[in-house]
Design a protein with these regions (language model features):
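Conserved acidic
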Residues: 1-205
Length: 205
């Protein structure tokens, strides 16, 4: 075996050996590999990393005696407690937020008209938009726009509706997949690593 470049590489190898023994899980993953190229492209478009951005009201200012907090082990918590799309995405015809059912993940392409952020922290990246017209940006993030066309997951779509005002929106394409928990052996693996991490945290040597 090759020496892993990082510690995470070692953990991935260990998990891979466990999941490869689960034939039921392998069949489920194989079934998802039949995804249409058009849907795959939408999934790539919808992908977004974490939010790291300055509040533009305070950019370039130095503050003293500030405080912060850290949510420890947030990623393992999400992996263990949240559900994920576990089937292939199929076309549907939803038109609004209220059409979305809690047991399904959604992938949509949506147009927003006269959209404006409610807060000084702006969340939509103009670079992720298929179309962006007549707007104002905060270092690449959209403060407001006459029209944008963007591909989103149901989670990001609901987040945008909660953090932006808009005159109206139009869902032009939509797909759904069933939400399910990750396999038990995966969850148990994460929990085992979490226990080990907390048990040996701060131990000398």
């Amino acid at each position: 075996d090759k020496i892993p470049v990082t510690s995470t590489g070692k953990v991935r190898k260990e998990l891979q050996k466990i999941t490869l023994k689960d034939t039921k899980w392998r069949r489920k993953v194989s079934a998802c590999n039949t995804i249409k190229p058009s849907v795959y492209n939408m999934l790539v478009e919808a992908f977004a990393g974490g939010y790291t951005h300055a509040n533009y009201i305070f950019t370039d200012e130095v503050f003293k005696n500030v405080d912060s907090f850290d949510e420890t082990s947030a990623y393992p918590y999400v992996l263990v407690t949240r559900r994920f799309p576990m089937k292939d995405f199929r076309e549907c015809r939803i038109k609004k937020r209220e059409d979305m059912l809690p047991n399904f993940a959604y992938l949509i392409r949506v147009k927003f008209y006269n959209i404006k952020c409610k807060y000084y922290n702006n969340f939509i990246s103009a670079s992720k938009c298929n179309n962006f017209a007549g707007g104002k940006l905060d270092n690449g993030r959209i403060i407001k726009a006459k029209e944008i066309d963007i591909t989103l997951t149901d989670i990001d779509f609901k987040f945008i509706l909660d953090t932006y005002d808009c005159e109206r929106y139009e869902i032009t394409q939509s797909y759904y997949a069933i939400y399910e928990y990750l396999p038990n052996q995966f969850i148990n693996f994460v929990l085992e690593k979490y226990v080990n991490k907390t048990k040996f945290k701060g131990v000398k040597g």
